[in-house]
Swiss-Prot record:
Keywords: Ribonucleoprotein, Ribosomal protein, RNA-binding, rRNA-binding. This is Large ribosomal subunit protein bL9. The gene is rplI. It comes from Geobacillus thermodenitrificans (strain NG80-2). Belongs to the bacterial ribosomal protein bL9 family. Transmembrane segments: none annotated. One of its GO terms (biological process) is translation. SUPFAM superfamilies: L9 N-domain-like, Ribosomal protein L9 C-domain. One of its GO terms (molecular function) is rRNA binding. Binds to the 23S rRNA.
């Protein structure tokens, strides 16, 4: 019997795959557990529509990420911090502070986990901070740390 897997089944198939399995296995296990449905023409058409919808969403997310990349690369985030002699900061600037400053200054909401700051910023001046917007799209955000008076 041909079935469409709704979830990954170890040793049998992955989600969205169409496979031939034994009738008893399909009826007594896969269907009852909600792991698969029968591969009827209507179900195949629904699966195809679902795949197309997912592809459209993925393409839209990629386009949005590229658009956001262009915006971010034009911006500079200004952060004022207390500093000592030689431009060393008291404390440091973290990805959370960068995300909050970006929201406050430019109205762009960005998750702090997307800001890939290896080490916190501990000096005054300009720093280029990598931002991972999408698995395929990365941007560079300029952060300008100034001395707080």
């Amino acid at each position: 019997m041909k079935v469409i897997f709704l979830k990954d089944v170890k040793g049998k198939g992955k989600k969205g795959e169409i496979k031939n399995v034994a009738d008893g296995y399909a009826n007594n296990f896969l269907f009852k557990q909600g792991l698969a449905i029968e591969a009827t023409p209507a179900n195949l058409k629904a699966l195809e529509a679902q795949k197309q919808k997912e592809q459209r969403q993925a393409a839209e997310e990629l386009a949005n990420a590229k658009k956001l990349k262009e915006q971010l690369e034009k911006l500079t985030v200004e952060i004022a911090a207390k500093a000592g002699e030689g431009g060393r900061l008291f404390g440091s600037i973290t990805s959370k502070q960068i995300a909050e400053a970006l929201q406050a200054q430019h109205g762009l909401k960005l998750d702090k986990r997307k800001i890939e700051l290896n080490d916190a910023i501990r000096a005054l001046g300009y720093t280029n901070v990598p931002v991972k917007l999408h698995p395929e799209v990365s941007a560079t955000l300029k952060v300008h740390v100034t001395e707080q008076k």
